């Protein structure tokens, strides 16, 4: 029984070791940044080794930094998004060409700089609109001269003429 258990443990260790053979081994990453995968590097090396014979064309992966100003004052973590392989672009099977299998997540594409969004909100592009800034101008306010001399009853304009042409009033009858 003890020999059987020992052989079973050794057999399972061999199976697990063959599944994860390169897990703890040495890997040559080179100058890689966050978000790149090793299949792109292997595709570049195989395309360079093929030389003029190979018709394979290697396209470099493009990274778009997602995030930025969204109306809040809190800093947001910027993370790179890999355009080439994020939607199954480099996993080309026997169909070849531009066939892409359906993947998860948004379809990120590269938008040319200075492009105008014709239909905003219908794609994954984010339009960055700066808040409006108004210039502050202080205008001098001075009271203007009166346009006309208006009749005000409290001033009693015209009373000086009444006393000249009218008879004096007598208080006793």
Swiss-Prot record:
Domain of life: Eukaryota
Gene Ontology CC terms: egg chorion; extracellular region
Record has Secreted as a keyword: yes
UniProt keyword annotations, A-Z: Secreted, Signal
Gene Ontology molecular functions: structural constituent of egg chorion
Record carries keyword Zinc: no
Location in or out of the cell: Secreted
Signal peptide boundaries: 1-21
One Gene Ontology biological process: chorion-containing eggshell formation
Transmembrane segments: none
InterPro entries (UniProt xref): Chorion_2
Principal place of residence: secreted
Described purpose of this protein according to its UniProt entry: Chorion membrane (egg shell) protein; plays a role in protecting the egg from the environment.
Homology family: Belongs to the chorion protein S19 family.
Name of this protein: Chorion protein S19
Organism: Drosophila melanogaster (Fruit fly)
């Amino acid at each position: 029984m003890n020999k059987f258990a020992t052989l079973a443990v050794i057999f399972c260790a061999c199976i697990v070791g063959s599944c994860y053979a390169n897990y703890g081994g040495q890997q040559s990453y080179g100058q890689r940044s966050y978000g790149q995968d090793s299949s792109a590097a292997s595709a570049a090396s195989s395309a360079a080794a093929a030389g003029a014979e190979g018709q394979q064309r290697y396209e470099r992966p493009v990274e778009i930094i997602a995030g930025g100003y969204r109306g809040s004052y809190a800093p947001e973590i910027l993370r790179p998004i890999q355009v080439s392989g994020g939607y199954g672009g480099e996993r080309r099977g026997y169909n070849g060409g531009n066939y892409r299998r359906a993947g998860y997540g948004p379809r990120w594409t590269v938008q040319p700089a200075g492009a105008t969004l014709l239909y905003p909100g219908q794609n994954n592009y984010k339009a960055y609109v700066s808040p409006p800034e108004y210039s502050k101008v202080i205008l001098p306010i001075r009271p203007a001269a009166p346009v006309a001399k208006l009749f005000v009853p409290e001033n009693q304009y015209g009373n000086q003429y009444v006393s000249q042409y009218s008879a004096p009033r007598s208080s006793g009858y």
